[in-house]
Each structure stands twice: as C-alpha cells, then as structure tokens.
Amino acid sequence: MHHSINIYQKEIITWDIFNWARALNYLDTEKSKQFKNSRVLEIGADNGGLSFWAAVNGAFVECSDLNGPSAIARENAQRFKLKNIEFQELNGLGLPYTNEFDFVLFKSVLGGIVRSNDLLKLKRIMSEIHKVLKPGGECLFIENMDGFFLHSYMRRRYGAAKNFWYYPSLKDFFILSKPFKSMKYQTFGFLGGGDFLLKNFRSKLDYYFEKIIPPTWHYIYAGIYKK
C-alpha cells in the first residue's frame, strides 16, 4: 500500500476504511503516472480526502464542492502545511475548464448528485469530466455500487437509499465509460458494509469472499477512465 494511503488513512478515507483503502490502493497502483507536478481536480470533495491524497504526493490540486469544501478540508491543509491545494465552489454538472487537468478525482459523489435513477445526468457528469481532462488524462474514482439485494435492503432501511441516494450498477459504470478512450476497474466489498457488529472482521473476510462471488455482488467500484 502506498505510504500516503497507509499513513493518512483517516484524512483520506472517513468510513469503511479497510475496504475503501484497498480500492484507493488499486487506483494508486494502476494510474498511468505519479501525482508529482500534475494538475488535479477533485469534485464533490466535502472533506477533501482525495485532494489530500494527491497533494501530499506533490500534485497541484483544486479541491471543489458545490458550496465549497468543508472546514475539515481546509483545516487538514493547514495542519499539514499543504500550500498546493486551492479551494473552490464548482458544480460537477458544469465545469468551467477544457483540457486542463491530468487527473479528476471523486469518491461517493454520483448517487448524491442524481438522487434517483437518472442515468442521463450521470452521463452529463462524466462528459464534463472528460471535457476538463487533458488528452491522456485520467478520472480516478471510487463509488458505491448497488451490489447484492441484501445491500439494497440495508441501505433502504438504514442508509442513504432512504433519502433516494442512487447506487449505480456495474452495467451503469460501463455505460458511463463510453466517452473515454479506455477504462479499467476493480470491485470490492461484500460483508464489510454497515456500521454494525463485527465490522472489522467482516471487512477482512471480504478479501477472500471477493475471489469467489460475482463482481455484481460487491458494493464498491474503483474506476480509472482515460481520455
């Protein structure tokens, strides 16, 4: 695991750390180049975890959210003396750039933007991301997948689905990759979701379960879409 992910897990990933850290490590090892001296945009940043990840590895980062990133994002930048992060208010449905970034980053964003099964709006977001990337640039992202039917049940009863959060399917993610020249992905997680009994134990079991169950049953999708 990359040193920055291992050292700064709590700053980069704020929930389900074991499984989401594995997804982030996949992006870190499979991206086409290092962050150093790259231009990076994070959308839907909230606490700016992915911006922090890129910045501590030498990128020049624009950390953005619809109403601006949270106070925590700014506090982390100050605490770790990161001068290479700027904070902005940006709407992922209308980004004011063209061919400017080496990487665009996001995590757990798509379902909150559409709040329903609105694939057209998801396509628009990915089209905007494609537009702002330089040729050869990459979108690195981690999202919640719809997963197994028990995941859907638990989310409707206890999680964000009761607020109409949308969880894309594996097929949806293939459709969303269409504007890009190439894509690769990996899926993670089966038992580890939810903040209830034996979470750490369940998350560690996922490493083995993932090898024997279909990827459509997993609940985390990590994608690398290249322009």
What are these regions (language model features)?
Residues K184-K227:
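A C-terminal cap/extension of S-adenosyl-L-methionine-dependent methyltransferases
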